[in-house]
Amino acid sequence: MEFFTMCVLAAGIGMALGTLGTGIGQGLAVKSAVEGTSRNPGASGKILTTMMIGLAMIESLAIYALVVCLIILFANPYKDIALELAKSVAK
């Protein structure tokens, strides 16, 4: 059962680190966009469009981290091997 405990721990840490990085990246992107708009209000349309594309790319990293963590939790390819090993050790 330690295998499943470690899978849950790995998924939790992976998701935490994935969202931490994307949160910091999105904050810095919005900060730069607001500074650029305050310096040149005429370019706010281009800045907003570029910022939205950048935020979508940054957010995709968090979605990839979520997908990997869900695979670790629910579709782990090593689950059967770990269960067989646990049964053989218990006998």
Curated annotation (Swiss-Prot):
List locations, semicolon-separated.
Answer: Cell inner membrane
Q: Which SUPFAM superfamilies does the record associate with it? A: F1F0 ATP synthase subunit C
Q: Where are the transmembrane segments?
A: 4-24, 53-73
GO MF terms here are: lipid binding; proton-transporting ATP synthase activity, rotational mechanism
Q: Where is this site: Reversibly protonated during proton transport?
A: 59
Q: Which UniProt keywords apply?
A: ATP synthesis, Cell inner membrane, Cell membrane, CF(0), Hydrogen ion transport, Ion transport, Lipid-binding, Membrane, Transmembrane, Transmembrane helix, Transport
UniProt GO cellular component terms: plasma membrane; proton-transporting ATP synthase complex; proton-transporting two-sector ATPase complex, proton-transporting domain
Main localization (coarse): membrane
Q: Which domain of life is it from?
A: Bacteria
Q: How does it sit in the membrane?
A: Multi-pass membrane protein
- What family does this chain come from, according to its entry? Belongs to the ATPase C chain family.
Subunit comment: F-type ATPases have 2 components, F(1) - the catalytic core - and F(0) - the membrane proton channel. F(1) has five subunits: alpha(3), beta(3), gamma(1), delta(1), epsilon(1). F(0) has three main subunits: a(1), b(2) and c(10-14). The alpha and beta chains form an alternating ring which encloses part of the gamma chain. F(1) is attached to F(0) by a central stalk formed by the gamma and epsilon chains, while a peripheral stalk is formed by the delta and b chains.
Query: Its biological function?
Result: F(1)F(0) ATP synthase produces ATP from ADP in the presence of a proton or sodium gradient. F-type ATPases consist of two structural domains, F(1) containing the extramembraneous catalytic core and F(0) containing the membrane proton channel, linked together by a central stalk and a peripheral stalk. During catalysis, ATP synthesis in the catalytic domain of F(1) is coupled via a rotary mechanism of the central stalk subunits to proton translocation.
**Name of the protein:** ATP synthase subunit c
What is the organism field in this record?
Answer: Citrifermentans bemidjiense (strain ATCC BAA-1014 / DSM 16622 / JCM 12645 / Bem) (Geobacter bemidjiensis)
